[in-house]
Amino acid sequence: MTIVDTSVWIDFLQGSDHWTKTRLKEKLNDRESILYNDIILLEIIQGIRERSGREEINSMFNSLVLVPHKRSTTLLAAEIYQELQRKGLRIRSIVDCLIAATAIETGATVLHKDRDFEFIANYYPVITEKE
């Protein structure tokens, strides 16, 4: 199981040549379980101006696994954020903490291209896939 960070989805949808796009394509072709949460979908859809584009994304995500939002996930994300702040690490987005918490609770690997996940993985049991 893999949870895919928004930055990877954006590269995938825009046709970027980043290694994560290739990796996501492989996972989709292999029919691996791709997880997402509502925040990831929101971040992707917020940047799409055309209604048809939003409908296309919604349709694509219907074939993926939605992880329902739980209070425990929110509390873990807040703990991650606060603990790393105490250690002097600047996490740029609380959303990354929420994605990491979702991955920890589901046992999924995070496919990303964002340094925040590597900081988190140094202190919490989140598995990341990197180049």
What are these regions (language model features)?
Residues 6, 38, 95-97:
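Conserved glycosyltransferase catalytic-site signature
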Residues 21, 41, 54-57, 74-78, ...:
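A general structural signal for well-ordered alpha-helical segments in protein cores
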Residues 1-36, 46-59:
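Short, well-structured N-terminal submotif of metal-dependent ribonuclease cores
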